[in-house]
């Protein structure tokens, strides 16, 4: 049985990107073809030459909300609030960071004005009701702070409001960016269109749970967090058309893979709107995509396990070793890979 430790690798701290490059598509791109072909060191801007006319790139069009708030308990202790998802106009599921857990009925006095009351708790998540001057989503857009990942050791600035967002983001609701999409700028998208590559979109609202570690030794015991997603009829038809013409379906990011796999019914992609808790790790056969663009993921993370299921665990760990040796930049603001699937029987 696979263990969490089977997905460990050593990463020097200085390779964790603390901010974006000046140009989105200037990030490096490691080409990881199916074995035994060698890895190639490229750039994201090389994608038009690496893809083929008729290929379909599938993006996640979720938009990150400024979901981080600060306040204090009535007793005076500081509280950090991270919105996970909205429930109506004035309620939200949140994560709280505070010295002591809050209980149902407790109030939080918000630094930006107004207050929030604790209505309930489920594990790491709290249900809060907000007494603020406008609907919560609108109010957050004015006063909220962008929630950068915990491995970025600085406060967010105005530049992050632009760069920790894809250029095609439109469906408001994520608290973390679908980071593979951050590499695509308008110039690159135009060159891909000119190459004959088509674009399709799903929506998956990335939750704060994406940063939660696997806390069990055996993978089969892990329970994934739930995230809302939508695969529309238009995208389903685009996928069918791409397959019919011999094009490849290429996921831009693990969120796209999780959405497409969650919408598979009897071996066919179907329109779907709802929640997914799908946990993809080696042993699972990914059938919805032919290739994947993805960033480099944390050791022992569920995202690393997903890409290992697609490309092979040994192959991925070898690629990560190569990335460390070649000084690639890691995680959300880091570099990317173009992955192709493992061969049958490859571990």
UniProtKB/Swiss-Prot annotation:
Chief localisation class: cytoplasm
Subcellular location per the Swiss-Prot or TrEMBL entry: Cytoplasm
Pathway per the UniProt entry: tRNA modification; tRNA-queuosine biosynthesis
Entry's EC annotation: 2.4.99.17
Gene that produces this protein: queA
Gene3D superfamilies per UniProt: QueA-like
Keyword annotations from UniProtKB, A to Z: Cytoplasm, Queuosine biosynthesis, S-adenosyl-L-methionine, Transferase
Entry-linked SUPFAM superfamilies: QueA-like (SSF111337)
Pfam families, alphabetized: Queuosine_synth
Protein name: S-adenosylmethionine:tRNA ribosyltransferase-isomerase
Subunit structure: Monomer.
Free-text function comment from the UniProt entry: Transfers and isomerizes the ribose moiety from AdoMet to the 7-aminomethyl group of 7-deazaguanine (preQ1-tRNA) to give epoxyqueuosine (oQ-tRNA).
Sequence similarity: Belongs to the QueA family.
Position of the signal peptide: none
